[in-house]
Amino acid sequence: MTNQTWSPSKACADFVADLQYADIPAAVIDTMKRDTLDWIGCAVGGAADRSSQPIKAVADVLGGNSQATSIDCARRNVVLAAMSNAYFGHILEMDDVDRDSISHPATPNLAAAFAAAEFAGKQGKDVLLAAVCGFEIMLRIGAAITPAHYKIFHTTATTG
């Protein structure tokens, strides 16, 4: 018999495994759609900025199978597409901010959700569901560990 004690990791995993799109309130979906459009605008601007060149060069050198599309329209393996999109989304420092967690939740969550959804052949509702799950977990963990954590670490990187 296994020990079924509660843990924060198990609670997060259960939340993600159990949440269905139909369970998400309409107001949350509307907010997520708005946040997604905002992030896309930031990422498109970031991809066009000259400071995006290093990540593009790294992604090109690492190569891999063409599995997902980056915001700059390049086809990359799914991990490099997600990494590039996250980088692009944060370049201009105009992405969203959550004050309680001192983080930018859209960048890591939407970058990963879009790349993974394209790779897996999923639809828009799946992207929104994944993003809601990611935001919820990231923001709760971030709020629990800040502000002391933020004195040393960038919360977006450590909780996203």
State where each predicted segment sits.
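N-terminal core-entry segment
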Residues: T2-G160
